Amino acid sequence: MKLTCVLIIAVLFLTAYQLATAASHAKGKQKHRALRPADKHFRFTKRCNNRGGGCSQHPHCCSGTCNKTFGVCL
């Protein structure tokens, strides 16, 4: 009888703990989901480097000019 009560209390405690942690994780995921569409849009937009920023074989300088000797945007 005592063992049964202890097991029931343990199961109730573990269930409550799982529900509490699942709720906190769900809130965290919801926060990241709100940022996800912006991340997808951000990946497809071209970013350019300002003057002094790095450039390489495929320059992405805002000015359109890359000094490939020094690897910087002009």
Curated annotation (Swiss-Prot):
Compartment list: Secreted
Keywords associated with the record: Cleavage on pair of basic residues, Disulfide bond, Knottin, Neurotoxin, Secreted, Signal, Toxin
A Gene Ontology molecular function term of the record: toxin activity
GO terms for cellular component: extracellular region
Principal cellular location given in the protein's record: secreted
Tissue: Expressed by the venom duct.
Tagged with keyword Disulfide bond: yes
Intrachain disulfide bonds: 48-62, 55-66, 61-73
Positions of the pro-segment in this chain: 23-47
Entry keyword Signal: yes
UniProt superkingdom: Eukaryota
PROSITE patterns: ALPHA_CONOTOXIN (PS60014)
Endpoints of the signal sequence: 1-22
Pfam name, any one: Conotoxin
Family: Belongs to the conotoxin O1 superfamily.
Function comment: When injected intracranially in mice, induces a series of symptoms such as quivering, climbing, scratching, barrel rolling and paralysis of limbs. Unexpectedly, no effect is observed on ionic currents when tested on locust DUM neuron.
Protein name as annotated: Conotoxin VxVIA
